[in-house]
Amino acid sequence: MPEMAKPAEGGKRYSLNYAAMYRLTNWDTVKVYTATTVAPTDYNREGTGDRFGGNAELQDTIATYQITNDKAFKIAIDRGNFEQGMRAKKAGEVMRYEMNEQIIPMIDKDRLATVAAGATAVSQAVSMTTDAYQDTLKLNEYLDECKAPLDGRVLWVTPAEYNKVKTAITTNILASGYNDKLVGKGFVGELDGVPVVKVPTSYFPTGIVALMTHRDALLGVRQVTETRIITDSEFVSGSILLGRFIFGSFILKGKEKAVASIVDGSAISS
C-alpha cells in the first residue's frame, strides 16, 4: 500500500511552553500573580516590642494580559479520494502533519516574536557586528545585570548566526575548551553555560538573528488546544479534521529585562 509523502516537520523541536502562576479570568484574559519581597531592616536588640521591625503582610502583584490569538483549521478527506488514492491519506497522519508543520511552528514563532519585541521595548537589542561571539556575550551581559539566574537561560540563533559564533570560537586560542561544549549537550550546544537552540531563520522576526531569555520571563498560555476527526458528517462523505487553538505569549512584569536580541539592521532596512 502506498504512503503519503511526509512534509518537512520540525515544530516539535522548538516548542516553548513556559509557565508561571496564573489564572484565567475572562475568556480572553489571564492574570499572573507574583509575590513581592521586602527590604531587610536592622534587628533591634534593645527593643521591648517587635525586634524584627513590625509585620509586613505578603502582597501579590497582579498583572493582566489579554490573549489575542484564536486560530483554527479544517481539512476534508473525501471518502472517494481516499479509496481511489489507495488509502494513502489517513486522517490520523494528516492531523499529525498539520500539527507538526503548521500549528506548533505557528505557536513557536509567536513566542519568539514576543521575546524579540520585549528586547526592543527595554532597549536590549544588540546591533549585529562582525564579531558574532562578542555580540552573544552582550546578551549574557544584559541578563547578568538584571540578575537573571544562569540556570534557565536559553539562546535561540539562526543557523547562519550559529555558524558565525562557532567559527569565531573554533578559530580562537580557547577553541579546545569550547569545542566539546558545542556538541552533545542536548540542544545543539552550550555557550558560556547557556543552552543554544538552532532555529530556522523563518521562525524569527525580520532582522533578528539571535534571542536570549530566561524561562521565568516568558509566559506561554494555551487556553484552548482542540483537535477532532469527524467521520459521520452530513456534509462530507469521508473525514473532516478540525482544530482550534487559543494561545498567547507575554513577557512578565518585573522580568522585562531578562530578554535580549541581536539585530541585523541591514536586513530590516532592506
What are these regions (language model features)?
Residues R79-A148, V259-S270:
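Alpha-helical scaffold segments that mediate packing/assembly in large oligomeric complexes
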